[in-house]
Amino acid sequence: MRQFENVTIVKKANVYYEGKVTSRTVLFQDGSKKTLGILMPGQYDFGTDEKEIMEILDGDMLVKLPGEDSWKEIKGAQSFEVPAKSRFQMDVKKISDYCCSYIG
């Protein structure tokens, strides 16, 4: 899906890691939620409340998912899932564009 129709955008940005990670929340009529954001190069550790599907629209990074011993390379358009109530790490190599879907 290249665009979203009939949504509400929350104006206030979600800002993490001193502005190196930012996103905007997109609310859908069915009650679901996504965030659209940008990751600057750097190393990040994130926690989840809900299950998340991270769709990398463009970028270059390594991702270490919960329970995994090794890092997974993500280049270009790829996605990965993160369980609820867990943590994952990202080592972003170049500016990356993402869409995160929250599965409650």
Swiss-Prot record:
Record's keyword terms, sorted: Glycosyltransferase, Transferase
Molecular-function annotations in GO: guanosine phosphorylase activity; purine-nucleoside phosphorylase activity; thymidine phosphorylase activity; uridine phosphorylase activity
Entry-linked Pfam families: Ppnp (PF06865)
Organism ancestry: Bacteria, Pseudomonadati, Spirochaetota, Spirochaetia, Leptospirales
Disulphide connectivity of cysteines: none
Family note: Belongs to the nucleoside phosphorylase PpnP family.
Organism: Leptospira borgpetersenii serovar Hardjo-bovis (strain JB197)
The protein's name: Pyrimidine/purine nucleoside phosphorylase
UniProt catalytic activity: a purine D-ribonucleoside + phosphate = a purine nucleobase + alpha-D-ribose 1-phosphate; adenosine + phosphate = alpha-D-ribose 1-phosphate + adenine; cytidine + phosphate = cytosine + alpha-D-ribose 1-phosphate; guanosine + phosphate = alpha-D-ribose 1-phosphate + guanine
Domain of life: Bacteria
One Gene Ontology cellular component annotation held by this UniProt entry: cytosol
Function: Catalyzes the phosphorolysis of diverse nucleosides, yielding D-ribose 1-phosphate and the respective free bases. Can use uridine, adenosine, guanosine, cytidine, thymidine, inosine and xanthosine as substrates. Also catalyzes the reverse reactions.
Span of the signal peptide: none
Database matches in PANTHER family: PYRIMIDINE/PURINE NUCLEOSIDE PHOSPHORYLASE (PTHR36540), PYRIMIDINE_PURINE NUCLEOSIDE PHOSPHORYLASE (PTHR36540:SF1)
InterPro entries found in the cross-reference section: Ppnp, RmlC-like_jellyroll, RmlC_Cupin_sf
Enzyme Commission number(s) from the entry: 2.4.2.1, 2.4.2.2
Keyword Membrane: no
